[in-house]
Regions:
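Subtilisin-like serine protease catalytic core
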Residues: 1-3, 14, 23-32, 74-92
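Divalent metal-coordination and catalytic microenvironments
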Residues: 35, 67, 111
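Catalytic-core environment of secreted peptidases
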Residues: 9-62
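Short, flexible micro-motifs
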Residues: 27, 59, 69, 114-116
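Hydrolase catalytic cores
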Residues: 39-105
Length: 125
């Protein structure tokens, strides 16, 4: 849908894309993914109080969902933009994405760039 946001995974230590992540644009020309979020060798809780590492776009999606929740809190709960929508989230997250100067955006690998929630909130200030 127009309000959904697609995300790919990257290794935050060296900014390399997750090799198993899909790449490319949709047949209708829509950009997917829209952003990249950390999703490689992420520390996760395991059973019995243990921790381990995991990789995958589901971890990137979880971080992006958390970012969306923070944006909705800022907009709706705190009264800054009471009519905030999913499209608003996508717009702010893609506008706030970090981009490499040597690349053209959007592109089939990174979409609009690496999600940068701090920069997104700077745009809102």
């Amino acid at each position: 849908s127009l309000e959904s946001i697609t995300v790919t995974a990257y290794q935050y230590r060296d900014n390399s894309l997750y090799v198993q992540a899909s790449r490319g644009f949709m047949p209708d020309g829509n950009v997917v993914p829209q952003v990249a979020a950390p999703g490689v060798q992420i520390r996760i809780p395991l059973l019995n109080g243990l921790y381990g590492n995991a990789s995958g776009t589901s971890l990137s999606a979880a971080q992006t969902a958390g970012a969306a929740a923070l944006l909705f809190e800022w907009a709706v709960i705190r009264g800054n933009q009471p009519y905030f929508t999913g499209s608003s989230v996508k717009n702010y997250i893609t506008r706030g994405a970090e981009r490499e100067e040597r690349m053209q955006y959007p592109n089939r690998d990174w979409g609009f760039g690496r999600m940068d929630l701090y920069h997104t909130f700077e745009l809102l200030a």
